[in-house]
């Protein structure tokens, strides 16, 4: 299977494989991920890890993976216009010899990926509404939910919240533009079966879709 993972950056601009904007849930640390320097982050211990290890640097992760399986990287965003993580990620994958694509919730990030890494497939992550993002204005939330940024982002695929399927936006992209639709995050075979007619790929955890669906 391909690997899907998220990237965050340290205060000094290093990219790490890490999901959350804060440290508490996944490490023994506290506070914003972005507030720590790379050396501090590397010294943290991940919760529930088989070995005593910290969040991996993206550079180390890419070297370890070495193109053995496809990689889907989600570039996390705080929707504050900071381009550091996107630029660092694109620089690190510039010479990566393996199948890789990039995606983000933030249209500005996807548009920048289009400029910095046009040869790499890029996707927009979205859902039916963004009411849980109060930092965004109503116009921004509407544009993201209805994919009104296409002229700037020009995504190659859509990654949609599976709870919102079926939905007109990904359906039209798939049926009229032959654009692949990925759904996130599927945690059991029953959910995978329900959305199967509407998607081409899934982000999954906790079960084997090759044998359980």
Segments and roles (model prediction):
Residues 12, 112-113, 168, 194:
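Phosphate- and divalent-cation-binding pockets in alpha/beta enzyme and binding domains
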Residues 19-129, 151-155, 160-163:
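Metal-dependent phosphodiesterase/phospholipase catalytic core, i.e.
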Residues 4, 18, 72, 203:
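Generic enzyme active-site microenvironment
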Residues 9-22:
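Glycine-rich, proline-tolerant flexible connector loops at the mouths of alpha/beta enzymes
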Residues 10-11, 80, 108, 165, ...:
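Short alpha-helical
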């Amino acid at each position: 299977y391909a690997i899907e993972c998220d990237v965050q950056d340290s205060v000094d601009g290093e990219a790490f494989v890490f999901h959350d904007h804060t440290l508490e849930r996944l490490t023994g640390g506290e506070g914003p991920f972005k507030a720590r320097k790379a050396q501090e982050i590397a010294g943290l211990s991940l919760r529930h890890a088989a070995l005593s290890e910290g969040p991996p640097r993206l550079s180390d992760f890419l070297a370890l993976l070495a193109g053995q399986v496809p990689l889907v990287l989600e570039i996390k965003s705080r929707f504050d216009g900071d381009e550091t993580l996107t630029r660092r990620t694109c620089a690190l994958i510039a010479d990566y010899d393996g199948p890789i694509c990039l995606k983000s919730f933030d249209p500005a990030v996807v548009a920048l990926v289009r400029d910095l890494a046009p040869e790499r497939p890029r996707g927009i992550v979205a859902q039916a509404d963004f009411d849980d993002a109060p930092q965004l204005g109503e116009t921004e939330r509407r544009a993201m939910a209805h994919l009104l940024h296409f002229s700037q982002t020009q995504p190659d695929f859509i990654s949609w919240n599976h709870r919102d399927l079926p939905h007109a936006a990904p359906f039209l992209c798939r049926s009229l533009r032959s654009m692949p639709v990925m759904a996130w995050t599927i945690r059991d075979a029953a959910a995978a079966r329900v959305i199967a007619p509407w998607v081409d790929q899934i982000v999954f955890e906790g079960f084997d879709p090759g044998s359980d669906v």
